[in-house]
């Protein structure tokens, strides 16, 4: 199916330390960026959330504190993601109620 896009579309999903938009942090962001000409690029970042990952979240996401200890923080990759996402529309499961607001919070904390 060909999409009729006016600007790039980022379809993305987050794994996080919980469901609190203010207190919780991103552990992983995976995305596909679809351009109006049909070209696609993909990205996947595992992120050190700078807070402990609970056993419940490890069971849910598969990510442990050990997995993220040497990964970059969101602040370390925020500029790169900002450039990648600039001018794009966004889509994803439950993205308007959770993923987009949490991503916006992370960008604000990073000073972007």
Model-derived segments and spans:
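Conserved non-catalytic scaffold segment of RNase H-like nuclease domains
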Residues: 1-112
């Amino acid at each position: 199916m060909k999409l009729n896009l006016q600007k790039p579309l980022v379809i993305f999903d987050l794994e996080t330390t919980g469901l609190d938009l203010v207190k919780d942090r991103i552990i992983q962001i995976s995305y596909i960026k679809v351009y109006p000409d049909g070209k696609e690029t993909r990205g996947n970042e595992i992120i050190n959330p700078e807070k402990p990952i609970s056993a419940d979240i490890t069971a849910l996401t598969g990510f442990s504190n050990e997995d993220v200890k040497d990964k970059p923080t969101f602040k370390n990759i925020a500029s790169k993601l900002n450039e990648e996402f600039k001018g794009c529309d966004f889509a994803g499961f439950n993205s308007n109620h959770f993923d987009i607001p949490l991503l916006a919070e992370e960008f604000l904390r990073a000073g972007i």
